[in-house]
């Protein structure tokens, strides 16, 4: 059972750097118009029949029968090769949490700068999702975002080091997803996803 860390009270801000938040952000920054978090494989396959790209993982590894894993690098390749506009996502931890919420913002290292700007002045609850490998990389983003929301300068290099050296990052490298880790800490997008009524779209 994963125990979330929460800082503050207000609209949830979900941080799952490796990798759900990063996959969602990458999708919306690269032509996907909506992302649907799903609870089960069965639900994901229903969306596949409706023309959705389906992405997902269980304990880091791609779910059998899905188009891609929970991988921003695989997602970019799929978008380049196809004409996908909608994505359904199933992950071990984050999508379960997202499915339980009516509203939420989604943040990662990929959009830390824009999130600190757009969420400043709002009442929010910063939630580090974590995994069975811990939540150090998510905690780093939560703490950095909290600083940014309070007007302090964010130390992006410190955040990057926490993510790269986390147990979750080492696990991903060990199962062949090191390119995702490298992408996530070296890319920046100007998009802030928001979940409303089960659908995630870009927030303006």
Identify the role of each PLM range:
Residues 1-6, 20-29, 38-84, 95:
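Residues that scaffold, gate, or flank divalent-cation-dependent active/transport sites
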Residues 8-10, 32-33, 49-52, 82-85, ...:
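Short coil/turn connectors at secondary-structure junctions
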Residues 12-15:
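Short hydrophobic beta-strand that contains or immediately precedes a catalytic carboxylate
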Residues 58, 91-92, 107-109, 128-130:
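Short, structured patches in soluble enzyme cores that scaffold and shape functional sites
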Residues 61, 65-104, 137-204:
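Long, charged alpha-helical interface segments
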């Amino acid at each position: 059972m994963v125990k979330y860390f929460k800082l503050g009270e207000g609209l949830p801000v979900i941080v799952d750097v490796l990798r759900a938040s990063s996959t969602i952000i990458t999708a919306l920054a690269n032509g996907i118009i909506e992302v649907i978090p799903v609870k089960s494989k069965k639900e994901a396959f229903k969306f596949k029949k409706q023309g959705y790209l389906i992405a997902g993982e269980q304990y880091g590894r791609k779910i059998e029968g899905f188009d891609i894993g929970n991988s921003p690098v695989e997602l970019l390749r799929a978008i380049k090769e196809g004409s996908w506009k909608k994505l359904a996502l199933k992950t071990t931890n984050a999508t379960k949490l997202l499915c339980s919420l009516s509203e939420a913002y989604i943040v990662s290292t990929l959009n830390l700068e824009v999130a600190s700007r757009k969420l400043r002045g709002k009442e929010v609850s910063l939630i580090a999702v974590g995994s069975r490998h811990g939540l150090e990389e998510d905690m780093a983003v939560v703490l950095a975002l909290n600083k940014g929301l309070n007007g302090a300068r964010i130390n992006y290099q410190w955040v990057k080091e926490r993510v790269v050296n986390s147990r979750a990052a080492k696990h991903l490298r060990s199962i062949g997803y090191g390119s995702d880790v490298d992408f996530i800490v070296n890319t920046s997008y100007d998009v802030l996803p928001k979940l409303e009524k089960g659908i995630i779209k870009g927030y303006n």
